[in-house]
Amino acid sequence: MTLRTINAKDAASLDRDLMNEGGFSLDQLMELAGLSVSQAVYRVHPPSKGRNVLVACGPGNNGGDGLVAARHLAHYGYKPTVYYPKQGKNELYERLKTQLHNLSVPFTSDFLGSLQTSDLVIDAIFGFSFSGPLRDPFPKVISLMEETQVPVLSVDAPSSWDIEAGPPKEGPGAKFMPQTLISLTAAKPLVKWFKGRHFLGGRFLTKGVVERYGLDIPEYPGVEQIVEVDVNGEGKL
C-alpha cells in the first residue's frame, strides 16, 4: 500500500483548522510535535547508544519543535546541546529557550565542534513550509549533516528537501539522507525519496479531520505518540 501524503498547502490548511475549529493553540501543537520527536529519538537511539544529542534548530516552527524535543530529552537523561543561530520572532521561542536554560541545556554557535562530540543529530531546521534558497549559516550546516557519520533524525523533512520534489538536484542537501525521518501529523510527498526508518507523530487528529484531508493514520500502540510506518521510499539520490 502506498502511504497517502499531504502537500504543503494542505498541511498549512490543516494546521489552521486545528487552531481554529479544533481549538488547539500553537503552543499545544508544538509541544505535541516535540514530544513525538523525543519519543522517536528514544526509539531509534536510546541513551545506551550515547547521550550527547545535537539539536539543530531553524527560525520557524520546525525549530520550535526541536527546542521542545531538547527539553524532553533532557528529562529522559540525554545531554542535548542546541544550535539555534537564527531565532524566530514569536515570543514562544523565547519561552522555550528559557525552559532549556532552566535545565542548564547548553546552546552553541559552533555546529562543527559540537557535531564532533555528538552521538546523534536532530535536524529541526526546515519543515514543510521550506522554499529555497538556503541562507547562511544553513548551507554549511546541511553539508555537514550530509557528510557526517553521526546518525541524523530529521523532523518532518530532511532540511533542504522540497516538500513535493524531494532532494535538490545539486548543492547542499543533494546527497542528504538522514537515517530517520519523523513526519508530523501526516507524511509529506517527499517520503517517496526517503529510505530509512520513518515514523509518524502527532496523535491528536479527529476522525473528521482525517476524512476531510484523506489521510492514512495508522493505529498508535498503547500510549505511544509515534508509530513506525514503512514508506517504501526509493532512497536514490
Curated annotation (Swiss-Prot):
User: Which cellular component terms (GO) are annotated to the entry?
Assistant: mitochondrion
What are the residue boundaries of the YjeF N-terminal domain, all occurrences included? 11-223
Q: Tell me the leader sequence span.
A: none
Describe how the cofactor binds: Binds 1 potassium ion per subunit.
Subcellular location, principal: cytoplasm
Domain of life, per the record?
Eukaryota
Q: Which reaction does it catalyse?
A: (6R)-NADHX = (6S)-NADHX; (6R)-NADPHX = (6S)-NADPHX
Record-listed K(+) binding positions: N62, D123, S159
> Which EC numbers characterise this protein's activity in its record?
5.1.99.6
| Gene3D superfamilies in the record | YjeF N-terminal domain
Its subcellular locations are: Cytoplasm; Mitochondrion
**Which GO terms fall under molecular function for this chain's record?**
metal ion binding; NAD(P)HX epimerase activity; nucleotide binding
Its needed co-factors are: K(+)
Say yes or no: keyword Isomerase present.
yes
* Binding locations of (6S)-NADPHX: N61, N62, G63, G64, D65, G127, F128, S129, F130, S131, G132, P133, D156
The UniProt keyword set, sorted, is: Cytoplasm, Isomerase, Metal-binding, Mitochondrion, NAD, NADP, Nucleotide-binding, Potassium
Membrane spanning stretches: none
Pfam families, per database record? YjeF_N (PF03853)
Q: Does the keyword NADP apply?
A: yes
Q: Which PANTHER family match?
A: NAD(P)H-HYDRATE EPIMERASE
Which HAMAP family does the record match to this protein? NADHX_epimerase
Family statement: Belongs to the NnrE/AIBP family.
Give the protein's biological function.
Catalyzes the epimerization of the S- and R-forms of NAD(P)HX, a damaged form of NAD(P)H that is a result of enzymatic or heat-dependent hydration. This is a prerequisite for the S-specific NAD(P)H-hydrate dehydratase to allow the repair of both epimers of NAD(P)HX.
Question: Could you identify this protein by its name?
Answer: NAD(P)H-hydrate epimerase
